[in-house]
Amino acid sequence: DGRVKIGHYILGDTLGVGTFGKRREIQNLKLFRHPHIIKLYQVISTPSDIFMVMEYVSGGELFDYICKNGRLDEKESRRLFQQILSGVDYCHRHMVVHRDLKPENVLLDAHMNAKIADFGLSNMMSDGEFLRTSCGSPNYAAPEVISGRLYAGPEVDIWSSGVILYALLCGTLPFDDDHVPTLFKKICDGIFYTPQYLNPSVISLLKHMLQVDPMKRATIKDIREHEWFKQDLPKYLFPEDPSYSXTMIDDEALKQDPLAVAYHLIIDNRDFYLATSPPDSFLDDHHLTRVPFLVAETPRDELNPQKXKHQGVRKAKXHLGIRQLDYEXKVVNPYYLRVRRKKMSLQLYQVDSRTYLLDFRSIDDXIDAEAQGKSSEASLTXSVT
């Protein structure tokens, strides 16, 4: 029918054209997995082009949203800014500075959640090294960038984030002029208009983020500790343990590129509660009070406010046994428990109406025993009442 097919994908209409989709952006994005950063699933290279299969978000650019709707209310501005800063913090923790943060590079999904995109100007940071490249959009660029001075990297993203916050709250830019030299002077002076309707608390945050001297400029730590920013802050944005991930990833599967693409597409697009999960009525059965359903607060819960949440039930003592054996478990539904790190099988026996016997059996031990012609009945059992 005349359509072009690349790998498993059929090309549709061209939505836009960019000039920085090169190897650096590909290397950066393929490493990233964060709820507020656009995901790169796959890269297909041809002699003339590089095709990047990326996450689709339907809400368009934050810039277009502000132009159409004007300034956002303080609560909504804070929610989006918290999400953006969480993504920026993730970049910096992985030694990447974006360098071109602006509303045009922040996309919105179907639930009005922010997604940072376009890492074409990003740069990998190294300890002790400074950058000099003047890049990014002038209205959002920090004074040290437009003046050609050396900069470490993270501080320029803080400045740009401050400009985005101002745009969210005011619907305009803090520094703007059609005459570029005049615009640069305004940025280097660091003086901007603060409307009377702005909360004094957020004004203090803006002034700290838009500090001309990068040494005095707010850090992510400063912003996170600011009273205005901490209001209604979702826990998942800045977990206490940065290594924590709500998704348990099979490293072996990710080594296979086609499997990796399918794996992440399924994880990112499924409903958090699987189709195999029992209806709410199942959770009312007193026999299941010993078998917990997954009820931990997760990014997906926070990002989809319309999703009905299940009521929690009491955790079973079996979880203590699994942890004691150094296993990691994930409850898919009340009758399906996934365990990783050591290959093992679990079987649940009902002893009577109130007692169950949970049988842990090592698959490897069973295979070895069968190979030696021995009985494979040895197992670890735990009584659950």
UniProtKB/Swiss-Prot annotation:
Q: Where is this region: AIS?
A: 252-297
Q: Which GO terms describe its biological process?
A: autophagy; cellular response to glucose starvation; cellular response to nutrient levels; cholesterol biosynthetic process; energy homeostasis; fatty acid biosynthetic process; fatty acid homeostasis; glucose homeostasis
Q: Where is the Protein kinase domain?
A: 1-229
| Catalytic activity reported | L-seryl-[protein] + ATP = O-phospho-L-seryl-[protein] + ADP + H(+); L-threonyl-[protein] + ATP = O-phospho-L-threonyl-[protein] + ADP + H(+); L-seryl-[acetyl-CoA carboxylase] + ATP = O-phospho-L-seryl-[acetyl-CoA carboxylase] + ADP + H(+); L-seryl-[3-hydroxy-3-methylglutaryl-coenzyme A reductase] + ATP = O-phospho-L-seryl-[3-hydroxy-3-methylglutaryl-coenzyme A reductase] + ADP + H(+)
Major site of localization recorded for this protein: cytoplasm
Regulation of activity is described as: Activated by phosphorylation on Thr-133. Binding of AMP to non-catalytic gamma subunit (PRKAG1, PRKAG2 or PRKAG3) results in allosteric activation, inducing phosphorylation on Thr-133. AMP-binding to gamma subunit also sustains activity by preventing dephosphorylation of Thr-133. ADP also stimulates Thr-133 phosphorylation, without stimulating already phosphorylated AMPK. ATP promotes dephosphorylation of Thr-133, rendering the enzyme inactive. Under physiological conditions AMPK mainly exists in its inactive form in complex with ATP, which is much more abundant than AMP.
What does the UniProt PTM comment say about this protein? Ubiquitinated.
- Which keywords fit this entry according to its UniProt record? ATP-binding, Autophagy, Biological rhythms, Cholesterol biosynthesis, Cholesterol metabolism, Chromatin regulator, Cytoplasm, Fatty acid biosynthesis, Fatty acid metabolism, Glycoprotein, Kinase, Lipid biosynthesis, Lipid metabolism, Magnesium, Metal-binding, Nucleotide-binding, Nucleus, Phosphoprotein, Serine/threonine-protein kinase, Steroid biosynthesis, Steroid metabolism, Sterol biosynthesis, Sterol metabolism, Transcription, Transcription regulation, Transferase, Ubl conjugation, Wnt signaling pathway
Question: What residues does ATP bind to?
Answer: 15-22
EC nos: 2.7.11.1, 2.7.11.31, 2.7.11.26
Q: What is known of its domains?
A: The AIS (autoinhibitory sequence) region shows some sequence similarity with the ubiquitin-associated domains and represses kinase activity.
Q: How does it assemble?
A: AMPK is a heterotrimer of an alpha catalytic subunit (PRKAA1 or PRKAA2), a beta (PRKAB1 or PRKAB2) and a gamma non-catalytic subunits (PRKAG1, PRKAG2 or PRKAG3). Interacts with FNIP1 and FNIP2.
User: What PANTHER family does this protein's entry cite?
Assistant: ACETYL-COA CARBOXYLASE KINASE, MAP/MICROTUBULE AFFINITY-REGULATING KINASE
This chain belongs to which protein, by name? 5'-AMP-activated protein kinase catalytic subunit alpha-1
Which species is this record about?
Sus scrofa
